[in-house]
């Protein structure tokens, strides 16, 4: 695939994080990419906040039933693919990822168009409870994998090549 065929969009799965997303969205939009927010079964109040974020380059897709982040991402991936996008940059709605890293992720994705690109979060701004929850998750993932050096088992900023990702998703 040449750079001329490379088309990326940002997908943000959102459940119970509409307020932090509203604060982070201007930083995310600074990347210059369009944004698809996947409303993953939010309350009416949270959905109203998401609706207030609509703009020419921001859309909200409703994913009913709140089946979880993975299903919300697949829903968003399939929509993006149907719109001709080749890559999706996924960033979590909770504001823990550095949106200013999106251009760097984009450059890497353009160089390595068939590879999944994962960022590393900055844990300095994370509340203690969330830090501990991540640490416990990392610990058990390391135990399961037999490895101790896991930087982020729950990476919230990635770039997916859509065709390959959807092919794997449809096999399972």
Name each region found by the language model.
Residues 7-9, 34:
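Cell-envelope/extracellular polymer assembly enzymes that use nucleotide-activated donors
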Residues 85-96:
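Short beta-strand-to-loop acidic/aromatic patch adjacent to the donor-nucleotide binding site
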Residues 16-30:
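Short, well-formed alpha-helical segments that are part of the catalytic scaffolds
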Residues 17-20, 42, 69:
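Donor nucleotide-sugar binding loop of glycosyltransferases
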Residues 9-13, 62:
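Short hydrophobic beta-strand elements that form part
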Residues 25, 33-42, 61-63:
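Short beta-strand/loop segment that forms part of the nucleotide-sugar
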Residues 64-79, 99-172:
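Acceptor/aglycone-binding surface of glycosyltransferases and processive sugar-polymer synthases
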Residues 39-48, 95:
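A conserved acidic beta->alpha catalytic loop
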């Amino acid at each position: 695939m040449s750079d001329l065929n490379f088309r990326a969009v940002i997908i943000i799965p959102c459940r119970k994080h509409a307020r932090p997303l509203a604060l982070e969205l201007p930083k995310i939009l600074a990347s210059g990419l369009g944004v698809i927010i996947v409303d993953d079964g939010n309350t009416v109040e949270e959905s109203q906040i998401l609706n207030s974020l609509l703009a020419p380059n921001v859309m909200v897709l409703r994913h009913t039933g709140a089946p979880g982040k993975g299903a919300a991402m697949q829903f968003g991936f399939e929509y993006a693919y149907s719109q001709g996008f080749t890559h999706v940059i996924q960033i979590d709605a909770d504001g823990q990822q550095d949106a200013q890293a999106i251009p760097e992720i984009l450059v890497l994705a353009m160089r390595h168009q068939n590879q999944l690109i994962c960022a590393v979060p900055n844990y300095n701004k994370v509340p203690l409870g969330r830090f501990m929850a991540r640490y416990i998750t990392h610990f058990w993932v390391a135990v399961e994998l037999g490895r101790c050096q896991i930087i982020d088992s729950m990476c919230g900023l990635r770039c997916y090549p859509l065709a390959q990702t959807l092919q794997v998703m449809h096999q399972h």
